[in-house]
Amino acid sequence: MSKDSKMRATINQKLTEMGERERLKELLRAKLTECGWRDQLKAHCKDVIKEKGLEHVTVEDLVVEITPKGRVLVPDSVKKELLQRIRAFLAQHAT
Amino acid sequence: MKMEDMSLSGLDNTKLEALAQDIYSDLVEDACLGLCFEVHRAVKQGYFFLDDTDQESMKDFEIVDQPGVDIFGQVYNQWKNKECVCPNCNRSIAASRFAPHLEKCLGMGRNSSRIANRRIASSNNMNNKSESDQEDNDDVNDNDWSYGSEKKAKKRKSDKVFLHSLKQHIPLNPNSPRRSKSVKHKNGELSNSVNADPYKYNYNTGINYETLGPDELRSLLTTQCGVISEHTKKMCTRSQRCPQHTDEQRRAVRVFLLGPSASSLPDADTMVESDCYDASDGQVLMSRLQWDGSSDISPSDSASSKASTNNSDSKKPKKKKKTSLGLNSTGGGGGGSGSGGGSSSQTSLVGLSNRKKKPKLPVPPAPSIYDNLN
């Protein structure tokens, strides 16, 4: 397992060093905005805030409410594309 | 490095896949967190709800979904069937036709003046019975002028205002004075009707020489070019120096209209010869004659030296200055040969004087001058 973790660490490091991580992040953000994921989630935020009260909302509240929903709401096409890119990167640099 | 390579190559696909999934979920979580921070900051700063409308306005501007109405609640052709009363002519006009009608009614749009001008041009056309399809003809540019249109010229100004205010009620009577926006001409001045058709010069009015008496003709011919165009049979109203007609043409017209004895051309060209003759300075004239011996002597010139009184009738192909100089040279040659030559020079000078002089002057004081010389 430590090998795995070492290996993971290595790969993550490579990902960051080569700038691929940033690129993937930007790609994801753009795609999610395009498909309306952001707006959906924002609307959900509004509900949460109205529920909790404007003054007393904390970051934690939001994170707890939003993140699971966010994960679910990502469209399949976006997910597939991203995974494809990651696999390509791994194939190129892991072996 | 070798160790890493070995460890990396030892991975199998499932692990790689798991790894990929992990990386993906990391990325998604990053995105979510980013959004949360943004929202939280907006809430705390107070601008989170700014882009929303309040409930009341939401109800006011809700999308309308009824039949016969658009989403704003407006009826489509609500004003189509309504009628308005025109303040100018007091007729009731359909609403969608109201604006163009008003434009024509008041005479203020672009089109309305164009149409009016065209109507006038065509009515003038009918009045003057001219041939009207000569756009690419030279004579189109003659400012031909109709005697009849001069009468209408006086009414022009009052007609303009009157015409515009009553435009739609004018029956199609081409002879009505109200419709005659005129074509008053000075030499070269364009009339209003020309502006309507920029590509057609104002050819439809011109002087019809048949209608003019001899006095009028003569006065016209002294000031204007007067060359009669073949196509329209009208006289050119440009100045004596109009570039479209040559002096020969002008002379021919004068001969034709006024008779052979009365042809006169008060041209600036011939100042050199005619003026010095009028001054009756024989010596000066003689010296001039002898000076120019190099110009061509046209055959008609020698003929004219024999026929002293009538050489003005002959149509000379050359331009005037040259022929006159040619005459001078024959005169000069004659003068140089002595008294016999002197007499021939007399006759040639007589011919010269006849051609250039005004008709009222008596024919030759020449013999008296040359008596002195001889």
UniProtKB/Swiss-Prot annotation, chain A:
Question: Per the annotation, which location comes first and is thus the protein's main one?
Answer: nucleus
Task: Please give the Gene Ontology molecular function terms for this protein.
Answer: transcription coactivator activity
Q: Which gene encodes it?
A: eny2-2
Stored Pfam families: EnY2 (PF10163)
Q: Which UniProt keywords apply?
A: Activator, Chromatin regulator, mRNA transport, Nucleus, Protein transport, Transcription, Transcription regulation, Translocation, Transport
Cellular compartments annotated: Nucleus, Nucleoplasm
Question: What is known about what this protein does?
Answer: Involved in mRNA export coupled transcription activation by association with both the TREX-2 and the SAGA complexes. The transcription regulatory histone acetylation (HAT) complex SAGA is a multiprotein complex that activates transcription by remodeling chromatin and mediating histone acetylation and deubiquitination. Within the SAGA complex, participates in a subcomplex that specifically deubiquitinates histones. The SAGA complex is recruited to specific gene promoters by activators, where it is required for transcription.
Which GO biological process categories is it annotated with?
A: chromatin organization; mRNA export from nucleus; positive regulation of DNA-templated transcription; protein transport; transcription elongation by RNA polymerase II
Q: Could you name the domain of life of the organism this protein comes from?
A: Eukaryota
* Disulphides: none
Indicate the quaternary assembly. Component of the nuclear pore complex (NPC)-associated TREX-2 complex (transcription and export complex 2). Component of the SAGA transcription coactivator-HAT complex. Within the SAGA complex, participates in a subcomplex of SAGA called the DUB module (deubiquitination module).
The family classification in the record reads: Belongs to the ENY2 family.
What GO cellular-component annotations does this UniProt entry give?
Answer: DUBm complex; nuclear pore; nucleoplasm; SAGA complex; transcription export complex 2
Q: What's the name of the protein?
A: Transcription and mRNA export factor ENY2-2
